[in-house]
Amino acid sequence: MILDLRDDPGGLLNGAVGVSAAFLPEGAKVVSTKGRDGKDGMSLSALPKDYIFSGHADPLKGLPSEVKNIPVTVLINSGSASASEIVSGALQDHKRAVIVGTQSFGKGSVQTVLPLSNGSAIKLTTSLYYTPNDRSIQAQGIVPDVEVKDKNRTYESREADLAGHIGNPLGGEEVNGVVHDDAVEEKAASQADKEAAKGKNKGKDKEKEAEEELSSRHNPDPAKDAQLKAALDLVKDPAKWRESLGLAAKKPAKKDKKETTKEDK
């Protein structure tokens, strides 16, 4: 099974816990929080009630063990944030899934909305999320077990790029976004106004490639999606899948460096 969480900006916490619970043993820790003082906050564990519709029976109960334990891969990229990082982190820490793609966004903060009398509200950061192995993803993100870059993605934006962002409380290396070489070259060529006609055709080609790449998300095509192909190859090879479980824990986070043009320098 493949969970495609690329460009998933997140959602409700209970939804993330529910998705995680569908793949983890009952009672397994999914996520916890800590405040500024470092004291433990809430801790949420995997329970059937988290994914069962009210009044319905457990759809996973009674399934053969071989079905419950099928290989799972999770696809992530720099657009995977918040709740999608909670799911990725939980399945990664429990070695239930192999994470494939590129480093996630790094949005590990908990916000509380405080309504005001005039109808507006203030969103206040009150704590940070931690994975089952007590990792903070804040400004660092989830490191994939198997890194596969997306050749069609020319720019990566992450939490660490935001001015005034909260740093990683565990001292983890912050991971910034990156402008890939081809994007920089295209910008420089445009500024210099060189080979206008050729550049125009190249721009159309890139637009076509981007449209095809977006379309492949809705109509999955491994031939055009290297990350999806890597995920498929893993689930088709159980031995390789098992070897890849937890690989990210054995390597440090990679810090992407922004490329700059000569004018920027």
Please give the residue ranges for each predicted region.
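C-terminal "post-core" interaction segments
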Residues: 1-265
